[in-house]
Amino acid sequence: MDKEWLEVCIYTSSEALEAISGILYNTGVKGVSIEDPKDIEFKKKHPGDWDYFDETLLKVKDTAIVKGYYKEDDKFNEYLDYIKKSVSNLDQFGIDKGKGLVEVHKVNEEDWENNWKKYYKPTKVSNKIVIKPIWENYDKKQEEIIVELDPGMAFGTGTHETTRMCINALEKHIKEDRTVFDIGCGSGILSIAAAKLGAKHVIGVDLDPVAVKSSKENIKYNNLDNIEILEGNLMEVVEGRANIVVANIIADVIIFLTEGVKAFIEKDGYFIASGIINSRKEDVIKKLEETGFVIEEVREEGEWVCIVSKIN
């Protein structure tokens, strides 16, 4: 393995972190780290929820930073051009890119390994669920449920507002006999949380083979045998119906999927949808209601929204 890596730093807004992470995952990125000033505020407000915390993160100010790590090869310049163009175009999708500045630095392999992992610390994201990176130690409290996670190259670390809101919604609605479908499962974090909260059976689906592999590995870390991970889209690879369908994606995809998703939800079942920026909330609600869903709850955290709807 090469001893030097290229670190691509994108200076942006908290709002754009998921979108930019997705841009990096579309390239040959070998690892991603995120520095979000909103996570620092969350830590300050919930100091008891963190077992360990890197105090240097308190120096993070108003600018969010996404860092991607690459080997220096013939494809890198192509990847870099794609990243710059994609970040520049975020405004067209109603996403505030902030500074939108892209920089490249050379870093040592050891620095890279430390950088991308040191920002992921055990985090309590709901009344019960604690997300714990597999390389960290954590003293579990009696009522807590631990989700072991190595996000690797797949999206989903548990620290983002949308993930927290989805987990809280799952915690509220899951019962022991429930079946859950997780659309765009990424690292498998929501599938694993659902299973550990008591779901009888969970199916996670993702179009990205890297995400499918990551989900399966994380399921093994958590010693679960009631989760099935499939590569593809919900309409083509899943049969049957679920009591709960959860999708932490983006507003446009949720709007596109809404009519199809309805056919996969049991009567009195729930559709938990997040990844929705606040400015698109009404668009998603309108589509859900037009499709026959009843809005049960709208959760908001920062600039993000989670909508819980129900089929009667």
Swiss-Prot record:
GO terms for cellular component: cytoplasm. Its EC number is 2.1.1.-. It is found in: Cytoplasm. Keywords: Cytoplasm, Methyltransferase, S-adenosyl-L-methionine, Transferase. It is an enzyme of class 2 (transferase). It catalyses: L-lysyl-[protein] + 3 S-adenosyl-L-methionine = N(6),N(6),N(6)-trimethyl-L-lysyl-[protein] + 3 S-adenosyl-L-homocysteine + 3 H(+). Pfam families: PrmA (PF06325). S-adenosyl-L-methionine binds at residues 163, 184, 206, 248. Signal peptide: none annotated. One of its GO terms (molecular function) is protein-lysine N-methyltransferase activity. Belongs to the methyltransferase superfamily. PrmA family. Methylates ribosomal protein L11. HAMAP family: Methyltr_PrmA. PANTHER family: ELECTRON TRANSFER FLAVOPROTEIN BETA SUBUNIT LYSINE METHYLTRANSFERASE. This is Ribosomal protein L11 methyltransferase. It comes from Clostridium botulinum (strain 657 / Type Ba4).
